[in-house]
Amino acid sequence: MLLEGKIALVTGASRGIGRQIALTLAKEGAVVIVNYNGSAAKAEEVVREITEAGGTAEAVQCSVSDYAKTEEMMKDLIARYKRIDILVNNAGITKDNLLMKMNEEEYDAVLDTNLKGTFNCIKHISRQMLKQKGGRIINISSVSGVMGNAGQANYCAS
């Protein structure tokens, strides 16, 4: 297995693309930390699927949009695992609305999760990756960042 002994943190891993990334990393031998902010049941389902296939995983709740909570999550994971080899910044949300109808909270929620969340995770893991002399950071994005969609000004900007 290509990733045997590696520790991988996947944000937004309870469903969609993040779920599939988590399953694929586990299949390649990585210990997978399934980060989620919404449904604990869906995150535990991903963990269960990984462990039933012989892998190792755990679910960790944290809104990556929150700077302090993201820092706390990273410190806790490093204390327990001693390293993080792979960070996949996948967490993302949408709050679609035409710009003229969009309120500031809808705009901010998307930017805080999709853009600031990526910053928060990289900020709080980068020193550890330098200390361990290695690591991989993978940032997932959307084609919507290149080709905008009506009603998604916030999402496209993020």
PLM segments and residue spans:
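Active-site helix of classical SDR
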Residues: 122, 158
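Substrate-binding pocket helix/loop in short-chain dehydrogenase/reductase
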Residues: 98-99, 106-111
